[in-house]
Regions:
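Class I S-adenosyl-L-methionine-dependent methyltransferase catalytic core
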Residues: 1-51, 55-57, 73-198
Length: 198
């Protein structure tokens, strides 16, 4: 890869800023509607006692948790550390541009999603994980009562002693159950309050 081109791509991305998930309400509302309308019963395999995976809503949860990109996992580097290190960021960009490990793309086609993926998966890097909102909602559908005047039931309550990054909270909102949670991390809790209040 031509060093001059690589430097230009690097500088262009640095000028744009870190590729956080969008925070505008139109985008968030669209993603929320996709999450709510997802047919989560398709995830449940009762015979084998398995709840499948779907990424619906994870991006919404992450959009409230910008600080998560800088949280250490053991001795691994964080995505923010890669972003702030010119040498490593260039190596990651080069892997996208050359198609080494990542799908090959020309500079003008690299998206914020591509950048987030590269920053998460760069060698020696790890990002904190999140509970899938669809899996949480499917669990609540199975194990927690719902409000039903027909059946005379009230919505059940889930207590989450370590809320994490909003996946289970979003699942509770989608499933229509009460959710009580605690989390010791102040920036995380602020993000969770924003999810709750939106």
């Amino acid at each position: 890869m031509n060093d001059k081109i690589l430097q230009e791509v690097h500088d262009n991305w640095k000028q744009r800023g870190f590729p956080y998930y969008p925070k505008d309400e139109v985008w968030r509302n669209n993603i929320y509607q996709q999450l709510v309308s997802f047919k989560r019963d398709t995830l449940v395999d009762r015979k084998n006692k398995i709840i499948g995976q779907s990424a619906h809503g994870l991006n919404l949860a992450w959009s409230f948790m910008e600080h998560a990109w800088g949280i250490k996992c053991g001795k691994m580097r964080t995505p923010i550390e890669i972003w702030e290190d010119e040498e490593h960021l260039k190596k990651g960009l080069n892997k996208i541009l050359s198609g080494t490990f990542f799908k090959k793309k020309p500079a003008h086609e690299i998206t914020e999603s591509d950048m987030r993926s590269m920053l998460r998966r760069y060698s020696g890097t790890q990002m904190v994980s999140n509970f899938r909102p669809t899996a949480a909602a499917a669990l609540y559908d199975i194990f927690v009562d719902k409000y039903s005047p027909l059946e005379g039931t009230e919505a059940g309550t889930v207590w989450d002693p370590s809320m994490g990054y909003g996946g289970r909270l979003l699942g509770a909102i989608c499933a229509g159950v009460n959710y009580i949670g605690t989390d010791p991390c102040i920036p995380t809790y602020r993000g969770l309050e924003q999810i709750r209040d939106r």
